[in-house]
């Protein structure tokens, strides 16, 4: 239908120079634009280009209502510049966004990386950001960390934006866990979505609960809902028969999602979602470009900027992650190695790679664990690994593993040795299913050392 309407509109223009197909003209018109992203993790190379992109989008769409929605995990404790500066760049980014458009942030598990949760919310509000979070309370006061929802004016239309976050305390900074009271997101949604999303013409959900929880929440939302997910560091879009548009925007601000509000021939609203790459090398906002350079100069040490390797070409994060998994397999004497995708942040640049760039790619360190598994089960584990943006929604269960080493030709009854990180071993059911595997810590192999050793032997 939409292709026909577009053809009708263009044909009318060719014949008369003006539209004689009002339904087609209405269907082509963008009623509002939303720039949506999550899991930013203090990706400072992308900060200035993001604000420049907002300026470009607004200039290219004059008069079109525009807003920015951020779906949690904007901060990154592992970024030494962010930690030492107490996120001054992140807060400047939010101030710049809020100055340009209404900006709403749904809390994730990394917002308390530098401050206690209440202080983090106050810092965000102070720079003009509207903060929401439905299922999180301050255990000391019993009060919500933020309202569950907010209204967003989009020209003549009003959207209701509802926020929900993960209840996995282990993903929060250790120091803030005792003060958090987190309701199960699915239970909370069942109790609160009906009232919050009732009688709203434009329902929007920002979920930082992950795909596993989202799968149970998606049937609870009205037809036509725009449902943004985050937490799993994945990127895809999916449209349900009900018109619900579900998507994740990736991580490290490598992409953003652009949601366009349109009308169908009957006058009902629907959303189109386009995922757009954000080029870190593109010209950025001058003020933020200068700020990033200045703050880095103030807080980086010679150890941070030491060169730890060199690459003939840039490596996207998936390629860098598979190289790391292959390094672990070799170091641990395993047939196949699996590393959870959220272990990795951004990719690696061409040329000299510094310690801080390496740490931004391989976010965590720790011991490697090994286990044995039969070939039939290993075949299933490999099939669930290395998911890209084109993987069908039916295969998505949340976080996944990057796998390397032997990836095929498994004999069903043969026993194979596999390796993973300490995080994978501790969360074996999540990554490797049931029955739980019996993991043993390798006596010497550590993740980052294994990757650096492989790097020095053969450039990836």
Could you describe each region identified by the protein language model?
Residues 1-6:
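Positively charged n-region of N-terminal signal peptides that target proteins for export
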Residues 15, 19-22, 228:
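Intrinsic low-complexity/disordered segments
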Residues 10, 21-24:
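Cleavable N-terminal signal peptides
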Residues 24-283, 287, 319-327, 387, ...:
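Acidic, metal/ion-coordinating pockets
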Residues 17, 164, 383:
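Surface loops and adjacent helix of pleckstrin homology
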Residues 33, 37, 42, 235, ...:
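Catalytic centers of hydrolytic enzymes
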Residues 7-17:
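Bacterial N-terminal signal peptides
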């Amino acid at each position: 239908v939409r292709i026909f309407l577009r053809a009708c509109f263009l044909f009318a223009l060719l014949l008369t120079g003006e539209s004689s197909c009002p339904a087609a003209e209405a269907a082509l018109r963008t009623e509002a634009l939303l720039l949506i992203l999550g899991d930013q993790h203090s990706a400072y190379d992308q900060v200035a280009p993001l604000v420049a992109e907002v300026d470009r989008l607004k200039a290219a769409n004059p008069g079109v209502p525009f807003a920015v929605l951020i779906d949690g995990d904007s901060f990154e404790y592992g970024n030494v510049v962010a930690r030492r500066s107490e996120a001054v760049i992140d807060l400047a980014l939010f101030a710049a966004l809020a100055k340009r458009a209404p900006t709403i942030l749904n809390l994730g598990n990394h917002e308390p990386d530098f401050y206690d949760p209440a202080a983090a919310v106050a810092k965000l509000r102070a720079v003009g950001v509207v903060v929401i979070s439905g299922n999180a309370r301050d255990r000391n006061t019993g009060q919500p960390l933020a309202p569950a929802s907010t209204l967003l004016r989009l020209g003549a239309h009003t959207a209701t934006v509802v926020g929900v976050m993960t209840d996995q305390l282990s993903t929060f900074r250790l120091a803030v866990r005792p003060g958090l009271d987190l309701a199960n997101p699915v239970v909370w949604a069942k109790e609160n979505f009906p009232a919050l999303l009732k009688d709203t013409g434009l329902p929007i959900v920002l979920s930082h609960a992950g795909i596993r929880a989202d799968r149970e929440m998606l049937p609870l939302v009205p037809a036509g809902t725009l449902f943004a997910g985050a937490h799993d560091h994945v990127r895809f879009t999916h449209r349900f028969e009900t018109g619900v548009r579900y998507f994740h925007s990736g991580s490290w601000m490598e992409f953003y999602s652009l949601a366009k509000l349109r009308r169908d021939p009957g006058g009902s609203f629907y959303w189109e979602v386009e995922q757009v790459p954000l080029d870190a090398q593109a010209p950025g906002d001058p003020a933020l470009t200068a700020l990033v350079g200045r703050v880095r100069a103030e807080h980086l040490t010679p150890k941070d900027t030491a060169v730890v390797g060199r690459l003939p070409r840039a490596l996207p994060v998936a390629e860098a992650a598979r190289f790391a998994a292959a390094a672990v397999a070799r170091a641990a004497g395993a047939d196949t190695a699996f590393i959870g995708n959220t272990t990795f942040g951004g990719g690696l640049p061409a040329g000299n790679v510094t310690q801080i760039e390496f740490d931004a790619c391989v976010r965590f360190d720790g011991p490697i664990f090994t286990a044995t598994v039969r070939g039939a089960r290993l075949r299933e584990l490999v099939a669930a690994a290395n998911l890209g943006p084109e993987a069908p929604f039916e295969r998505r269960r949340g976080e996944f593993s990057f796998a390397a080493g032997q990836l095929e030709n498994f004999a069903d009854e043969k026993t194979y040795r596999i390796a993973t990180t300490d995080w994978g071993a501790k969360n074996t059911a999540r990554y490797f299913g049931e029955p739980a595997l019996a993991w043993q810590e390798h006596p010497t192999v550590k993740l980052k050392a294994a990757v650096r050793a492989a790097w020095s032997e053969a450039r990836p």
